[in-house]
UniProtKB/Swiss-Prot annotation:
Its EC number is 7.1.2.2. Pfam families: ATP-synt_ab (PF00006), ATP-synt_ab_C (PF00306), ATP-synt_ab_N (PF02874). Gene3D superfamilies: 2.40.30.20, ATP synthase alpha/beta chain, C-terminal domain, P-loop containing nucleotide triphosphate hydrolases. It catalyses: ATP + H2O + 4 H(+)(in) = ADP + phosphate + 5 H(+)(out). The record marks S363 as: Required for activity. This is ATP synthase subunit alpha. It is a peripheral membrane protein. One of its GO terms (biological process) is proton motive force-driven ATP synthesis. Produces ATP from ADP in the presence of a proton gradient across the membrane. The alpha chain is a regulatory subunit. F-type ATPases have 2 components, CF(1) - the catalytic core - and CF(0) - the membrane proton channel. CF(1) has five subunits: alpha(3), beta(3), gamma(1), delta(1), epsilon(1). CF(0) has three main subunits: a(1), b(2) and c(9-12). The alpha and beta chains form an alternating ring which encloses part of the gamma chain. CF(1) is attached to CF(0) by a central stalk formed by the gamma and epsilon chains, while a peripheral stalk is formed by the delta and b chains. The gene is atpA. One of its GO terms (cellular component) is proton-transporting ATP synthase complex.
Length: 508
């Protein structure tokens, strides 16, 4: 075995030393004029550019974020107590880079790639700039490969594809993060690499999220990038860009990547804080004038690459917080206009016990059925119609209106569909089981059962299939469509299932 130092083979270290250029270098230096609140004003850095990394004499790193005639504004990646007026600042003429690689999977890190989970050193495979150009039109291909969230409402009515950007928005405590975590948990079965970017989150929340991912076996294919409210604003500002850069590295290798930004409302607030500290001219609601560009540039980096570039994909799930259900405020409307659709979580539905509290009427996926398997398309169209009719007719019930039998039947069907769409946290369901569930609802197989027993019937029926007819589930998993033969089998098996399991309890 080769001798190692700090986990690296001796021959690699020797090679690096030989390759290093020891010749003198000309370096542009400046001096700190003023420092405070995580930002510094530096003079004499005349050749500095936006996004350049600089180093203070104490070793603290920073990034240039504003340019003036006689000085530049720098955000600090460390505590400003280690920087004082008159300190020397060294220009690097480089864009900030972050480490990435497979070694980061299963770890919790800060936006600079430093581990913060006590798990030891991470040896990167590469360093990548945090700011890259989005793939061009010619580098992309249409979004048509489905990304399964395991959430019935989303996979059936608001389908997401690899390479898409789908916004999740709603008030506080309505389940936005839960939807993102469930989507990550679902990816463990499909080999998708996940990156969860937590922006200004409490440490207790991060610990709970990491524990949830570990408990459900999804942490091993996930990188958690965490920033906290008491950290320098610079770390909170670069967090989504750093996560995106790491995701792009895997995408360029042909991998499918999912990145969650939780949340961009806090990121916008951080950018506003930094911009005001740097004395930049405020715009609407005191946000900088380029806040729209900042988020558009970030989210445009999500893409489905064509086969010439490896066919990788980066899917973005940004999260935004609304206040009192108002989605027409500045940041949410910006993000709605940038993304390829939104999933809106309704406080009233949440309080009524409907989980996930997705308002189907205000939610949309602009990719639509092109990112949905044929089997789901076969059942989802009827599902949406039944649900829409139910909610329309249910309004008349509130006024005690007399309804004919056909209308009552539609209402009863709608109640069962709505019950079927309810789903507990982290109860993700494979796509083939979802297709079967909706087939039963559409076909009227559940009409004779009380609403409160609908989910129990479906769960037991799927368990019955696994036990006696696993080939049906295997076919659906592989072919993802309801052929005539499979429909015939599902129908006959359900009759057999009823006789064996529900012979004496139907309708009770």
């Amino acid at each position: 075995m080769k001798e190692e130092v700090l986990g690296l083979p001796i021959d690699k270290i020797e090679k690096k030393i030989k390759e290093y250029d020891f010749s003198p270098r000309i370096s542009n230096i400046g001096y700190v004029k003023h420092v405070g609140d995580g930002v510094a004003e530096v003079s004499l850095l005349n050749s500095a550019f936006i996004g350049e990394m600089v180093v203070f004499e104490s070793g603290i790193q920073g990034m240039v974020l504003s340019l003036k005639e006689d000085s530049v504004g720098v955000i600090l990646f460390g505590k400003d107590e280690y920087v004082k007026e008159g300190d020397v600042v060294y220009s690097t003429s480089k864009i900030l880079q972050v480490p990435t690689g497979n070694g980061f999977l299963g770890r919790v890190i800060d936006p600079l790639g430093n581990p913060i989970d006590g798990g030891g050193l991470i040896f990167p495979e590469a360093y990548v700039p945090i700011d890259n150009e989005a793939p061009s039109i010619f580098d992309r291909e249409p979004v048509k490969e489905p990304l399964y969230t395991g959430i019935r409402t989303i996979d059936a009515l608001i389908p997401i594809g690899h390479g898409q950007r789908e916004l999740i928005l709603g008030d506080r405590q309505t389940g936005k993060t839960t939807i993102a975590l469930d989507t990550i948990i679902s990816q463990k079965n499909y080999g998708t690499i996940c990156i969860y970017v937590a922006i200004a989150q409490k440490r207790t929340n991060i610990a709970r999220i990491v524990q949830t991912l570990r408990e459900y076996g999804a942490l091993s294919n996930t990188i958690v990038i965490a920033t906290f409210p008491d950290e320098p604003p610079a770390l909170r500002y670069i967090a989504p860009m750093a996560g995106c850069a790491m995701g792009e590295y895997f995408m360029r290798q042909g991998e499918r990547v999912l990145i969650v930004y939780d949340d961009l409302t806090k990121h916008a607030n951080t950018y506003r804080e930094v911009a005001l500290l740097l004395r930049r001219v405020p715009g609407r609601e005191a946000y900088p004038g380029d806040i729209f560009y900042l988020h558009a540039h970030l989210l445009e980096r999500a893409a489905k690459l064509n086969k010439r570039l490896g066919g990788g994909a980066l899917t973005a799930l940004p999260i935004a917080e609304t206040l009192s259900g108002e989605i027409s405020t500045y940041i949410p409307t910006n993000l709605i206009s940038i993304t390829d659709g939104q999933i809106y979580l309704d406080t009233n539905l949440f309080n009524a016990g409907i989980r996930p509290a997705i308002n189907v009427g205000l939610s949309v996926s602009r990719v639509g059925g092109s990112a949905q398997p044929k089997g789901m398309r076969q059942v989802a169209g009827r599902l949406r119609l039944d649900l829409a009719q139910y909610r329309e007719y249910a309004m008349f019930l509130e006024f005690g209106t007399e309804l004919d039998m056909a209308t009552k039947k539609k209402i009863e069907r709608g109640r069962r569909v709505e019950e079927l769409l309810k789903q507990g946290a982290h109860e993700v369901q494979p796509i083939e089981e979802q297709i079967i569930s909706f087939y039963l609802a559409n076909g009227g197989f559940l009409d004779n059962y009380p609403v409160e027993k609908v989910k129990d019937v479906v769960i037991k029926y799927i368990a019955y299939l696994k036990l006696k007819y696993s080939s049906v589930l295997t076919f659906l998993r592989e072919e993802l469509q309801l052929s005539d033969q499979i429909i015939y089998q599902l129908h006959n098996i359900f009759q057999e299932f009823e006789k064996e399991v529900y012979a004496n309890s139907t309708g009770s």
